[in-house]
Amino acid sequence: MKQALRVAFGFLILWASVLHAEVRIVIDSGVDSGRPIGVVPFQWAGPGAAPEDIGGIVAADLRNSGKFNPLDRARLPQQPGSAQEVQPSAWSALGIDAVVVGQVTPNPDGSYNVAYQLVDTGGAPGTVLAQNSYKVNKQWLRYAGHTASDEVFEKLTGIKGAFRTRIAYVVQTNGGQFPYELRVSDYDGYNQFVVHRSPHPLMSPAWSPDGSKLAYVTFESGRSALVIQTLANGAVRQVASFPRHNGAPAFSPDGSKLAFALSKTGSLNLYVMDLASGQIRQVTDGRSNNTEPTWFPDSQNLAFTSDLAGRPQVYKVNINGGAPQRITWEGSQNQDADVSSDGKFMVMVSSNGGQQHIAKQDLATGGVQVLSSTFLDETPSLAPNGTMVIYSSSQGMGSVLNLVSTDGRFKARLPATDGQVKFPAWSPYL
């Protein structure tokens, strides 16, 4: 956790910009299909009220994953503070085989100890499946809760948790001198801060694989330009500002390259920059429009959108040469793909019969599953563990963010109150 805290510390510099209403997760459907689990309010060992509801954070994280259905607090058969106090039979009677208990203790130096135990109610009393403790300052209490959630989630599912991740997105506010803002928040909408404000549109944020930088599109020079901004100090590097269109940046998984789309020669085509040398090479060529690159895990192949066949479809190409290969065949058009970190599937915007939804395609079998049921869905971005997708959709006269699990069972919204929200991008593990 110490290493993760050092990485996340860079974000603290920007917290002074937290001036706006934050997005919050509103669950629409799918909780009941998750695995039942007990999450007990963490026992507070200090005076007055606890400074943070750590148990509530853990319960919300597990619920938001779509894989768990935490028992409502009003139905908890007991509220133990330690593994030894858990009565297995009381929980087993409710169909619950795992319970999270914990403690929060203030220290004389102003810090806090946060401890949790994951208890197996199917074993002997006090059987602990996982446990840990963290010493943190007050501003890191939510982070400690997310850390406990990650460990519990991984122990019970075998999948690395992604609750300490963040999302970047663009908000078009309701007026003001700088109506366009690039913001970053925790994955659940908390701890939001502004990375950049502009009087001109901002588009397409993309995370570097170490989570320290964001690439995005700005129009502040009078035309589109690609820039990379370092989050810790705000430093901005201009990557491309060619005539016509510069857009759709995507960092390679190994962090050495940036793919993007340019139309400096007419049609949109894909280019890749070596970030160390600044050298740019063209990947696609021809009269078709090729855009929206996303990397495969090998950092050598791209999936991208092309109208080579007339309507937009997703293709694959090696950055070192070779003809593009079409990989989407279902639906009237498919675009804006995001390939999973293991390369086994991708999510994309799929249109068919006048509907535009987020779909998942198995890259081995070609099988497609429609995940979303919202309106005019756009710009899907996968969580680093591949269990959830964040995307934007139209609601009323504006745009909002939505979450859907990659099995399609869990759906939630992240409504904002101060503008339209677009171009979500899920961070890597932090």
Swiss-Prot record:
GO biological process, one term: protein import
CC annotations in GO: periplasmic space
Domain of life (superkingdom): Bacteria
Residues in the signal sequence: 1-21
Record's keyword annotation contains Cell division: yes
Major place of residence: periplasm
Subcellular compartments: Periplasm
A Pfam family assignment: PD40
Keyword Ribosomal protein: no
Keyword terms, alphabetized: Cell cycle, Cell division, Periplasm, Signal
Xref: InterPro entries: 6-blade_b-propeller_TolB-like, PD40, Tol-Pal_TolB, TolB_N
PANTHER family: PROTEIN TOLB, PROTEIN TOLB HOMOLOG
Family: Belongs to the TolB family.
Function: Part of the Tol-Pal system, which plays a role in outer membrane invagination during cell division and is important for maintaining outer membrane integrity. TolB occupies a key intermediary position in the Tol-Pal system because it communicates directly with both membrane-embedded components, Pal in the outer membrane and TolA in the inner membrane.
Alphabetical list of HAMAP family matching this protein: TolB
Known partners and oligomeric status: The Tol-Pal system is composed of five core proteins: the inner membrane proteins TolA, TolQ and TolR, the periplasmic protein TolB and the outer membrane protein Pal. They form a network linking the inner and outer membranes and the peptidoglycan layer.
Protein name: Tol-Pal system protein TolB
Species of origin: Shigella boydii serotype 4 (strain Sb227)
Phylogenetic lineage: Bacteria, Pseudomonadati, Pseudomonadota, Gammaproteobacteria, Enterobacterales
